[in-house]
Amino acid sequence: MASLISFSLLPKPKAVRSSISAPQTQTINTEKLEDKFGRKGIKFSESNNIPMVELKVRNGSSLKLSLSDAHVLSYKPKVYWKDEGFEEVLYTVDGDESRGGVGVVIVNGEEPKGGSSVISGCDWSVKDTDSDAIDALQIELSCTAGVLDITYIVSLYPVSMATALVVKNNGRKPVTLKPGIMSYLRFKKRSGAGIQGLKGCSYCPNPPLSSPFELLSPSEAMKAESSGWFGSEEGEKPGIWAVEDSVITLLEKKMSRIYGAPPAERLKAVYNTPPSKFETIDQGRGLFFRMIRIGFEEMYVGSPGSMWDKYGKQHYFVCTGPTSMLVPVDVASGETWRGAMVIEHDNL
């Protein structure tokens, strides 16, 4: 596979603002972007008045990204050898504001009960694009939120996609952040959804980070199962740690968990870190996708259970992604923090 993500040649810091807050949005001209950044495999356009960019590599695998909110709305890799062997990986819901997909979240870690993402409504701009013989495509977005300069890099390869988050603190004081990259994955059936690779890992029931693209709010994610047919998650209480004892964790029941080392363990010189990757299992389609975390200390896994049909769709969905929620990230003045997520497969 091509070089995963390049963190070099990042945008220079913008003017420092006095607090962590999101600026006003501006109009994005896709025609100008196409002239400046468009190239083979990278196409800028508008869809329903929403500025978009589509990445498509040589084997036909594609990705669609909403430019105004840095929201990945579609990832359709080639997973079968037949001519039309493409499958949508992401679960999205259209509307005034699209939900689901893949999105980045950054919450002010100094707020004890969480809060909204500091980049909600952020003024994103395209900084650069790059390609390698259309077998590796990349687009770089950036925005400023208070004292933070934020760079978001989305990359596409023949059998994988990657999103990378780079946060620079231009303020005079340290900042505490709870970052995450959340993916809403599509499954054909509720009964055929699962993950493998987390056996032996500690986990704790916990609500997800709140975001504009969430399908279930943090309170909905923690709500007990409404139907008795598939059991109840009432036994899982926030703050109570357990160890995953299953080779395959079934996701038909409702759950909202953080997989990672307990905060107290992380104070020790040596402790067990969670696996850097695990696989999703979609038995209905016979597909497997590998979720990889880089730079983050935790993995979130949430399944809707009986609330799966909230949006009236035929497919089941699961929310997962790398995060640093239980132990926030401290970024000193002038310092930079980096994290990334990769979705890859070997279904071919």
Curated annotation (Swiss-Prot):
This protein's superkingdom?
Eukaryota
- InterPro entries xref list: Gal_mutarotase_sf_dom, GH-type_carb-bd
An example Gene Ontology CC term for this record: chloroplast thylakoid membrane
Instruction: Tell me the membrane topology, using the record's own terms.
Output: Peripheral membrane protein
Q: Name one GO molecular function term.
A: catalytic activity
Record carries keyword Transit peptide:
yes
Q: Which UniProt keywords apply?
A: Chloroplast, Membrane, Plastid, Thylakoid, Transit peptide, Transport
User: Could you state one GO biological process linked to this protein?
Assistant: photosynthetic electron transport in photosystem I
Q: Does the keyword Magnesium feature in the UniProt annotation?
A: no
Location of the transit peptide in the chain: 1-17
Q: Where in the cell is it found?
A: Plastid, Chloroplast thylakoid membrane
The annotated phenotype of a deletion mutant is: Malfunction of the NDH complex. H(2)O(2) accumulation in Dark-Light transition.
- PANTHER family cross-referenced by the UniProt entry: APOSPORY-ASSOCIATED PROTEIN C-RELATED (PTHR11122), PHOTOSYNTHETIC NDH SUBUNIT OF SUBCOMPLEX B 2, CHLOROPLASTIC (PTHR11122:SF18)
How it assembles, according to the record, is: Part of the chloroplast NDH complex, composed of a mixture of chloroplast and nucleus encoded subunits. Component of the NDH subcomplex B, at least composed of PnsB1, PnsB2, PnsB3, PnsB4 and PnsB5.
Q: What is the role of this chain? A: NDH shuttles electrons from NAD(P)H:plastoquinone, via FMN and iron-sulfur (Fe-S) centers, to quinones in the photosynthetic chain and possibly in a chloroplast respiratory chain. The immediate electron acceptor for the enzyme in this species is believed to be plastoquinone. Couples the redox reaction to proton translocation, and thus conserves the redox energy in a proton gradient.
- This chain belongs to which protein, by name? Photosynthetic NDH subunit of subcomplex B 2, chloroplastic
Q: Which gene encodes it?
A: PNSB2
